[in-house]
């Protein structure tokens, strides 16, 4: 399993992670999605954004805005998601999966503990890229 995500660093320990994709095999077809509470303990594999043109081309299918993608490590929850999908697909192992599972989170703060995630969310808020003005707000300005 490969883990790809957008990431914005807040400080040495904290950051925002969203649009997390779990890729299995060589396929980039979406095989499912899950909604989770907050990004967990997965860690950045490389501090440099992904630069492989083939990977970037495929990742762009899954993005709303043009931002860098990073590779992260898999965490325990991601492994459980893979096992659940393999089971529901009638496969004997997550290694037999082929495609992409999208993870959507309620919080974007990378923090495995929900209470700490809530606290950090209150402290940091959201970066401007997550702020979408409504039609009403646009008309007022």
Regions found by a protein language model. Name each.
Residues 24-29, 95-96, 137-141:
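Flexible, charged surface loops at secondary-structure boundaries
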Residues 89, 95-117:
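Short connector loops at secondary-structure junctions
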Residues 59-97:
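Acidic, metal/cofactor-coordinating or nucleic-acid-engaging core segments within structured domains
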Residues 111-141:
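Glycine/proline-rich loop-helix segments at beta-alpha junctions forming the active-site rim
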Residues 34, 38, 105, 141:
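Glycine-rich anion-binding loop/nest that anchors nucleotide
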Residues 73, 77-84, 102, 128-138:
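Amphipathic alpha-helical interface surfaces
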Residues 1-69:
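Active-site and ligand/interface coordination hotspots across diverse enzymes
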């Amino acid at each position: 399993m490969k883990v790809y995500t957008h990431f914005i660093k807040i400080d040495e320990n904290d950051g925002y992670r969203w649009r997390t994709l779990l890729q299995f095999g060589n396929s980039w077809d979406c095989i499912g999605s899950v909604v989770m509470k907050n990004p967990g303990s997965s860690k950045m594999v490389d501090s440099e954004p992904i630069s492989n043109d083939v990977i970037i081309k495929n990742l762009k299918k899954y993005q709303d805005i043009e931002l860098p993608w990073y590779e992260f490590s898999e965490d325990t929850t991601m492994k459980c998601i893979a096992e659940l999908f393999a089971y529901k697909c009638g496969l004997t192992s997550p290694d037999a999966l082929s495609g992409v599972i999208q993870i959507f989170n309620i919080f974007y703060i990378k923090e495995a503990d929900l209470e700490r995630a809530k606290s950090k969310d209150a402290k940091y808020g959201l970066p401007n890229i997550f702020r979408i003005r409504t039609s009403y707000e646009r008309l007022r300005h």
